[in-house]
C-alpha cells in the first residue's frame, strides 16, 4: 500500500515573527551605530600602517624611566587597596538592606536597590573627575572614586548572594527568637563569607586596572605619569611604563585567581 508521505505541520507563526523581528532590530541597531559612529572597515585598514608605526616609535625601550615609575605605581596600588578596603566596608549595610531575606521593609529594599543602580550608572573615571574638582588634584579623589565604585558593585553582588543562601539556618534562628542582627551574623555571614571574599579579590583586580587611568583626570597614580609621557611624545618611556603595569596586573591577577580558587 502506497500513499503520500506525511508532512510536518508549519511552525507557529508567532515564534517566526519574533525571530524575524529580533534579527531586524539587531540589523537596524548595527546600521545605526555604524552610521553615527562613522565606523568604517576601510578607514581601519588605512590606519594599520600608522598603528605599527606608532608602536615602532616605542623601540628601543628607554629603561631610564624605571626610577620614575616606582613611586606612581606604588601610589596606584595604594589607591586600589584603600578604595577596595573602604568600599568593602561601606557596602556591608547596603548588602543586607538590599536583600529580600534580610531587610525589614520592602520600601527600604527597593530604595537601596534604586540608589545602588543610580550610583553604578556613573563610571569611576567621571567620579574621579568630579572629586578632583572638589578635593583638588592628588590620589585622594582617586581613592574616593574607587570607594564609590567598589561599594556599589559589591553591594549589588552581595545582595544577590544573600538572597541565594540556604534559608534553613535563618528559619531555625527565627524559631528560637533570634533578632535580625543575630540572624545575619550567625545565619547569613557564614554562608556568604567565602564568596564575598572572592568578590573583593576580583574587584581589587578591577580597581588596580581602573586606578591606572584615573591620573588622566588628575586623580593621582601612574596615569598622571602616563599622560606626561604621551604629552611629550616620549613613546619609549611609555612602552616601559605599559610593560611594568602589564606585569603587575598579571601578577595580581594570578595571585587573586589562585586565592579565589581556594575560597570557592
Give residue ranges: language-model regions.
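Membrane-cytosol interface at the C-terminal ends of specific transmembrane alpha-helices
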Residues: 138-188, 194-203, 254
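Generic hydrophobic transmembrane alpha-helix motif, especially the helices
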Residues: 116-150
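N-terminal, non-cleaved signal-anchor transmembrane helix
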Residues: 1-85, 92-93, 97, 101, ...
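Cytoplasmic-entry segments and transmembrane alpha-helices of multi-pass inner-membrane transporters
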Residues: 94-128, 157-160
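Glycine-rich helix-loop "coupling/hinge" segments at transmembrane-helix boundaries
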Residues: 133, 208-245, 264
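Hydrophobic positions within alpha-helical transmembrane segments of bacterial inner-membrane proteins
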Residues: 84-92, 96, 100, 125, ...
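C-terminal transmembrane helix and the adjacent membrane-cytosol boundary/short C-terminal tail
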Residues: 12, 18-22, 239-264
